[in-house]
Design a protein with these regions (language model features):
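Short acidic-aromatic low-complexity motifs
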Residues: 2-35, 170
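A solvent-exposed, acidic/Ser-Thr-rich amphipathic alpha-helical stretch
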Residues: 6, 26-83
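A general structural-boundary detector
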Residues: 15-16, 40-43, 94-95
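A structural signal for well-ordered alpha-helical scaffolds and beta->alpha junctions
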Residues: 10-13, 50-53, 101
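Tryptophan-centered motif/residue detector
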Residues: 17, 21, 25-29, 44, ...
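A beta-strand edge to alpha-helix "cap/lid" segment located at domain peripheries
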Residues: 3-4, 58-175
Length: 175
């Protein structure tokens, strides 16, 4: 017998995605975790508790506000209450042509009632380093102010619920 209903897991994941990746409301996103959650971020380390996650995510996303997340796919494991998803950490190229991406995979474990009890994030470190370097060089060549513009020109080919507007200012209110 499944631990959680598939429809509940799907709805919780869509809310998680729309709140964080699309809406970029990091306070509301942190509230989707249990008070005692576990979070392992491959680069930044381990965190314990919702407030630790909030204290980490807000300054990171402010510092790297030009990055957005393009959905590729997700799978649901009803028996274990898990959602695994694959995405691209994306920056629009300052020339207006193309994107600079590095892929990531995350594993969410559901606690019920719309909350997550754990998350593990993994991404391609070498590809991240290349994308960061290429973006910095492209900004110097094409548009030094590009990071402040927070463009979101290419959300990819995911379903409608996984995409937002063309700039950070156009992000939808999710609450």
């Amino acid at each position: 017998m499944p631990k959680f209903d598939r429809a509940e897991l799907e709805q919780a994941f869509r809310t998680y995605w729309r709140t964080g990746a699309v809406g970029e409301d990091w306070d509301a996103w942190a509230d989707l975790f249990t008070e005692d959650c576990r979070y392992f971020e491959h680069f930044y380390g381990r965190m314990r508790g919702r407030e630790a996650v909030r204290a980490w995510i807000k300054p990171v996303m402010e510092k790297h506000g030009e990055i957005y997340t393009a959905y590729e796919w997700h799978v649901i494991d009803e028996d274990r209450g898990r959602v695994v998803f694959y995405m691209q950490n994306r920056r629009d190229h300052p020339s207006g042509q193309g994107t600079l991406d590095f892929p990531g995979v995350s594993i969410l474990e559901y606690a019920g009632d719309g909350r997550w009890k754990s998350e593990e994030d993994y991404w391609a470190v070498k590809q991240r380093e290349v994308a960061m370097r290429e973006y910095e060089e492209a900004c110097r060549r094409h548009d030094p102010d590009h990071p402040r513009k927070r463009t979101r020109w290419n959300w990819g080919d995911g379903p409608e619920w996984s995409r937002g507007g063309r700039s950070w200012a156009e992000r939808p209110a999710v609450r």
